[in-house]
Structure formats: C-alpha cells, structure tokens
C-alpha cells in the first residue's frame, strides 16, 4: 500500500475519552497508528503518534480540519504534520 506518514500531537488537560475520540476520527479516515507514546504529567495529557494513511484519495486538509475540530470539542490542541515537515522543523 502506498501511504503518507504523519506526526500527530495531542496536548491539553486530561479528561476521560481523549484517546477514544481522537482515534475514532483517525479510523474514520482510514489512518493507522504506526507508533504511539502517551503520558499524563501533573494533569496534562500528552500524546504523540506516528500515523499512516493511504496516499490515494486521502484528503489531508479535511483530516486536519476534523482532527482540529475534535480537539477543540475536547479542549485539547491537536496538530497534524506530514512526517517530512516534522523532520525538517526538528532537525539539528
């Protein structure tokens, strides 16, 4: 399968349902989690995922909008960056 990889970060106050609701949006866009790290630091929820989506017929803008909207409804910040952009921004 030809695919695109993304880094997805989620940060905000911890509450019930963050993982469930974020991953539900991901599944609706056929986005697969390749790797995940999640922790709660003094009540602050943090999660970073390496995710993969099919290149064919995948609407990145719509996915980003859906993730942002779900994040806002949860009171957390969700960022979706293509892996290449993330690597370029975080290189030393």
Swiss-Prot record:
The record's section on CDD domains has: ACT_1ZPV
Task: Name the GO cellular-component terms.
Answer: cytosol
Q: Which InterPro entries match?
A: ACT-like_dom_sf (IPR045865), ACT_dom (IPR002912), UPF0237/GcvR_regulator (IPR050990), UPF0237_ACT (IPR022986)
Q: Which residues form the ACT domain?
A: 7-81
* Signal sequence, start to end: none
Tell me the superkingdom of the source: Archaea
GO terms for biological process, alphabetical = DNA-templated transcription
Which SUPFAM superfamilies does UniProt cross-reference here?
ACT-like
Q: Which NCBIfam families match?
A: PRK00194.1
Annotated family: Belongs to the UPF0237 family.
- Show the HAMAP family listed in the entry: UPF0237
Query: What is the recorded name of this protein?
Result: UPF0237 protein MA_3235
- The record lists the organism as Methanosarcina acetivorans (strain ATCC 35395 / DSM 2834 / JCM 12185 / C2A)
């Amino acid at each position: 399968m030809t695919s695109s990889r993304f880094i997805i970060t989620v940060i905000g106050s911890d509450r019930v349902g963050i993982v469930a609701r974020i991953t539900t949006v991901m599944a609706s866009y056929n986005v697969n989690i390749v790797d995940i790290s999640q922790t709660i630091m003094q009540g602050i929820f943090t999660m970073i995922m390496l995710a993969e989506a099919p290149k064919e017929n995948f609407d990145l803008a719509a996915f980003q909008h859906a993730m942002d909207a779900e994040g806002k409804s949860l009171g957390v910040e969700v960022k979706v960056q293509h892996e290449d952009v993330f690597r370029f921004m975080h290189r030393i």
